[in-house]
Swiss-Prot record:
Transmembrane segments: none
Cellular component GO terms, alphabetical: cleavage furrow; cytosol; early endosome; endosome membrane; extracellular exosome; focal adhesion; late endosome membrane; nucleus
Descriptive protein name: Rho-related GTP-binding protein RhoB
Organism: Homo sapiens (Human)
Lipid moiety-binding residues (S-geranylgeranyl cysteine): C193
Modified residues (ADP-ribosylasparagine): N41
Amino acid sequence: MAAIRKKLVVVGDGACGKTCLLIVFSKDEFPEVYVPTVFENYVADIEVDGKQVELALWDTAGQEDYDRLRPLSYPDTDVILMCFSVDSPDSLENIPEKWVPEVKHFCPNVPIILVANKKDLRSDEHVRTELARMKQEPVRTDDGRAMAVRIQAYDYLECSAKTKEGVREVFETATRAALQKRYGSQNGCINCCKVL
């Protein structure tokens, strides 16, 4: 029996952990060196609720320099992972400011999973000290949940690519969301060529 194919696109600020999340899930290895992504694709097989699914994983660049290139990733998307980092309250602020408007524009009826990356850094003393200097603190679970409600996300999950905690759950949840029937006049992402 042929696998069902679904397309997953990951968005979020630069350095918020998108690429590490994808690499840990698809290759089971944690990259120790940060190299900003321009555009990467991975494929991973996952079984959810007895269904074999081939997930096309589309990594995107979070930096503003790529704001005009990123929409090329959106056509035919089945689910969005919208990421922020627990050690960067600013990356959570950018969810409603930047990422939701962009995704809702190009993918109006695609389910969004809000993902808190780098969960392991929430209790890291060095991170807490650095954030305290700027009168900030790591993002709390309640803040993430509240944001998920605010943006009407399909679900909210937390994970750590470094410890692998929660990684599989993120992709299982995303796959379930991608498999659900969509409602609304527009199925999936609009073809960005029409809007550019």
